[in-house]
Design a protein with these regions (language model features):
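Extended substrate/RNA-proximal surfaces in nucleic-acid metabolism proteins
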Residues: 2, 29, 42, 47-158, ...
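Histidine/acidic-residue-rich catalytic or RNA/ligand-binding cores of hydrolases
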Residues: 15-18, 47-51, 139-146, 166-180, ...
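Short hydrophobic alpha-helical runs that function as membrane-insertion/retention elements
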Residues: 36-38, 157-158, 190-192
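Metal-associated gating/positioning segment near the N- to mid-region
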Residues: 12-48
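Short acidic/histidine-rich active-site segments
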Residues: 188-202
């Protein structure tokens, strides 16, 4: 399968990643990508950049080494009400907006409360992608999320990093299989995410191909294959 884009990656600005923006862009060019998303963690994750970082993204060229850059953030979902940790004024400055649950800054609720919050975020017009919904950080009902994603043209991410053995996320494999099966059933597109924290991991989806094969997931529902389809679906 041809891959044209990877839009969930982090640079040293996130505080716990290990490559610069230019190193990431060069690696994307070396791998033949057309589009690279740089999505730094928002303030709820310890050690990440201050919100003023996002205010200054305008100084960065949107094309490096022949690769188009989408500069944005991975915004933290804070609770079962769907509250986020980055103000709308900052979100408006971003090319792409991902939202996800991280244990360091999430107020856990029941599975129903967690799911309600996630559906609220999926329906938020500022949010394009939900990061690693299947990693098991919070208990979730996936079917309402898939249906909401279809209604609002929000992409659910199938996250490669969550399936690394070193991540110790025992429910990630089965959760992602469930999400893929539901998305196939309801014909809902997904996005593959490397969640790269170092340049070598850009467009690395090696942990996902088995899941795609097991579910017989249609290639036409994978948004990484074609930049034009990706942008049209998200109205970018």
């Amino acid at each position: 399968m041809k891959i044209e884009l990877d839009v969930h990656t982090h640079t040293i600005a996130s505080g716990h990643a290990f490559s610069t923006l230019q190193e990431m862009a060069q690696a994307a060019a070396d791998k033949g990508l057309k589009v690279l998303g740089i999505t730094e963690h928002s303030p709820g994750v310890p050690g990440t950049c201050h919100p003023i970082y996002f205010r200054n993204l305008h100084v960065i060229p949107r094309r490096m080494y022949g690769v188009e850059l989408l500069l944005g953030a991975e915004i933290n979902i804070l609770d079962g009400k769907g509250n986020l940790d980055l103000d709308e004024d900052y979100m408006k400055m971003l090319d792409i907006r991902i939202a996800g649950i991280h244990s360091l800054c999430y107020e856990y609720g029941t599975i129903e409360e967690n799911t309600h919050g996630m559906v609220q975020v999926i329906s938020n017009p500022f949010i394009h992608i939900i990061s690693h919904p299947g990693d098991g950080t919070a208990a979730l009902h996936f079917e309402p999320m898939v249906l909401a994603a279809k209604e609002h043209h929000t992409l659910l991410e199938i996250n490669n990093s969550s399936l690394k053995p070193t991540r110790n996320k025992p429910n990630a494999r089965e959760n992602n299989l469930t999400i893929l099966r539901l998305c196939k059933k309801y014909e809902v597109p997904v996005i593959l995410g490397s969640d790269a924290h170092i340049s070598f991991d850009i467009a690395r989806y090696d942990n996902l191909y088995e899941l795609l094969q097991l579910t017989g997931f249609p290639e036409e529902l994978i948004m990484n294959r074609d930049v034009k389809s990706f942008k049209e679906y998200l109205h970018l």
